[in-house]
Curated annotation (Swiss-Prot):
Residues 79-91 have a biased composition (Basic and acidic residues). A motif (Cx9C motif 1) lies at residues 33-43. Keywords: Disulfide bond, Electron transport, Membrane, Mitochondrion, Mitochondrion inner membrane, Respiratory chain, Transport. Mammalian complex I is composed of 45 different subunits. This is a component of the iron-sulfur (IP) fragment of the enzyme. It is a peripheral membrane protein. GO terms for cellular component: mitochondrial inner membrane; mitochondrial intermembrane space; mitochondrion; respiratory chain complex I. A motif (Cx9C motif 2) lies at residues 56-66. This is NADH dehydrogenase [ubiquinone] iron-sulfur protein 5. Contains two C-X9-C motifs that are predicted to form a helix-coil-helix structure, permitting the formation of intramolecular disulfide bonds. The gene is Ndufs5. It is found in: Mitochondrion inner membrane; Mitochondrion intermembrane space. Pfam families: Ndufs5. Belongs to the complex I NDUFS5 subunit family. It comes from Mus musculus.
Amino acid sequence: MPFLDIQKKLGISLDRHFMFLSAEQPYKNAARCHAFEKEWIECAHGIGGTRAKKECKIEFDDFEECLLRYKTMRRMHDIKKQREKLMKEGKYTPPPHHSGREEPRP
């Protein structure tokens, strides 16, 4: 507990916005990972941190992938490497609009 709680005196709560993405949003639009966070919170609710790490690992991994997109980025990197490899071998020619040579617009 801080000696001087400025957030409470000013009536704001910055921490609340960093806790849950599924908290009430200003324009009622759900966050991108709302469904995954909700599943994880429902799974972990009331069972304690130690059990939740074991029993809710699948839900947490889904939520983490939605937030960080590390598998998606790895897949995109692999696709880009494969495309560059095929271009060097001469087996793939990208369409003109992918190389910056698109048709002039009227």
